[in-house]
Amino acid sequence: MSGVRTREAGEVFGPRTALFADVLSVGLATSLVCLPLVTAPAALSTACAVLRGAGQDRPVTAGRYFALLRQRLRAGDLVAGAVALAGLLLFAADLALAGAGLPGATVFAATAAAIAACAAVVALRACARPESLTDWRAAVREAARDAGADVGGSGLVLLAVATAALCAWMLLPLAFLAPGPLALALTAVDVRRSAAVPR
């Protein structure tokens, strides 16, 4: 197999498993950065940017992740995190109210879940957009446009979130690695969309 690259000196993993190992290391770094919660959008956006670099022969390492994160952290990232956290708390409060036995609780819970799913798709697709590194408003605007125009991609985003949540539920330590494969899935959906619609 002449097209297969051989392992270089000092390389821990072979060429077939290198990206997988890199995704897991970036996932672990992302989990650590997400711990304050308000840093979650910036952490996921940075992971997507690092993984996007794999297609351009740039290294996908935790070191590059932290270097890029140091360059881009700004007040807008914390505001985006605060908005995301407020949305999660509002959704949790809505579900608690629906579970309290109020009239029409079933319809209310279903409506709240649908709105939350749409908001999550737009937010996650915004994290995968290159614009999220510098301008969250532009990233959200483009992500909302993509979410409506690319329904298949939005379905893939929901499937990736469900898979990450299921893995974390089945085995708790996987929760610390789940952001890596999730970021890879988000990046793949965005790259797929970019290839389909040249910008």
What are these regions (language model features)?
Residues 1-110, 119-199:
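Helix-coil boundary and N-terminal low-complexity module in membrane systems
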